[in-house]
């Protein structure tokens, strides 16, 4: 039974909705970040990170590019591996047993690496050797994927330049390394600004590097809306680097141009959604919910949710990622994720009186 206080709150909310509908300007088309798959589009237990298959999956899921890590073997062959040891991502090739003792990449020749170890996967077909830089870049070229090299090896950047011209990304914290790359390439140079919160100082460093450039950081508090706006207006890229949920949503709202992510997706015009669900001009009282669960499990899927609203809401995607979003005035947010063997769903719960002028959810089958 509704109390007079509840009825009054509902009436005020409906009046606000009616006023909003009478003076709503034409909706602008939002611009979302370029999506880069961190260590490729890996899938836990199935598709290994930093693998050729992770490049193919990045193409399948609609990512623009992949980030990869480059290191030398003992005999100076460049291969793709993030850790100093093989233990987290590899098994013994002979019997697929776990590596109980630390196995350092720097202690192995390339022949030993290829002969004795494979990447971990539940699918025997994906238990492949750790790829060379050339093998991974060849896969990027085959599938039309932009490579982002996280590497301290100048030789790796020369290989990328030979294979891609200027259409690749150099991702490193060293100004001197970026300046070296600039002697032979006008690739996109992404610099780690460190703890310096000054956008002006970042611009000064980037101008010294020259050419196409930007910043990349894992520091969530650095990428404020003014910081992002200042760099973007100066013509530079701003990358949010592996921000966990829900911080990647704030980075998107603040205006980053690139998201380097382990899970995030944005609406993708390259693909026709399998299903689209929409609603307009919905008023919610505190604890009111909007819930949608599809009926079919999808092997390789994506779910995005676009929202124009005023108020505070809690959003859950696939009962996996949870966001608390607040817009004091009518504003836009977009969140999304990739998934494997899952039934897509979302839930929106109002935390205070909220008006959702527009909701669009897209489900993709990749």
PLM features: residue spans?
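Phosphate-group recognition and catalysis centered on beta-loop-alpha active-site segments
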Residues: 23-284, 345-350
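Short, surface-exposed beta-strand/strand-loop-strand elements in extracellular ectodomains
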Residues: 311-321
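Short beta-strands within extracellular/lumenal beta-sheet-rich domains
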Residues: 283-298, 332-336
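A short beta-strand element within beta-rich, extracytoplasmic domains
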Residues: 299-311, 344-350
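Extracellular carbohydrate recognition and processing domains
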Residues: 320-342
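Exposed low-complexity, polar/acidic, P/S/T/G-rich flexible segments that act as propeptides
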Residues: 352-366
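Bacterial N-terminal signal peptides
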Residues: 12-20
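Bacterial N-terminal signal peptides that target proteins for export
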Residues: 2-11
């Amino acid at each position: 039974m509704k109390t007079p206080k509840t009825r009054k709150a509902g009436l005020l909310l409906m009046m606000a909705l009616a006023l909003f509908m009478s003076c709503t300007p034409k909706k602008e088309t939002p611009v979302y970040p370029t999506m880069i798959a961190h260590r490729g589009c890996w899938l836990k237990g199935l598709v290994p990170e930093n693998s050729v298959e992770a490049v193919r999956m990045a193409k399948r899921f609609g990512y623009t590019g992949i980030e990869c890590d480059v290191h030398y073997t003992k005999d100076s062959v460049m291969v793709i591996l993030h850790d100093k040891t093989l233990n987290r991502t590899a098994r013994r090739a002979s019997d697929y047993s776990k590596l109980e003792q630390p196995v350092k990449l720097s202690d192995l020749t390339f022949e030993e690496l290829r002969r004795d170890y494979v990447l971990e996967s539940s699918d025997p077909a994906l238990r492949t050797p750790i790829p060379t830089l050339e093998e991974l870049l060849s896969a990027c070229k085959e599938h039309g994927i932009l490579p982002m090299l996280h590497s301290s090896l100048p030789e790796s950047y020369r290989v990328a330049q030979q294979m891609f011209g200027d259409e690749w990304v150099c991702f490193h914290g060293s100004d001197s390394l970026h300046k070296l790359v600039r002697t032979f390439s006008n690739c996109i140079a992404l610099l780690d600004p460190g703890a310096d919160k000054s956008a002006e100082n970042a611009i000064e460093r980037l101008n010294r590097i020259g050419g196409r450039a930007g910043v990349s950081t894992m520091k969530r508090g650095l990428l404020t809306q003014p910081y992002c706006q200042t760099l973007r207006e100066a013509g530079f890229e701003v990358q949010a680097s592996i921000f966990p949920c829900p911080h990647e949503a704030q980075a998107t709202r603040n205006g980053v141009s690139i998201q380097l992510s382990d899970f995030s997706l944005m609406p993708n015009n390259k693909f026709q959604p399998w299903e689209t669900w929409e609603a307009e001009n919905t008023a919610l009282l505190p604890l009111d919910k909007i819930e949608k669960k599809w009926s079919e499990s999808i092997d390789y899927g994506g779910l995005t949710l676009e929202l124009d609203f005023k108020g505070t809401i809690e959003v859950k995607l696939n009962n996996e990622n949870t966001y608390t979003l607040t817009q004091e005035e009518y504003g836009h947010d977009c969140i999304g994720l990739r998934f494997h063997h899952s039934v897509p769903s979302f839930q929106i719960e109002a935390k205070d009186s909220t008006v959702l002028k527009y909701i669009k959810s897209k489900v993709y089958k990749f």
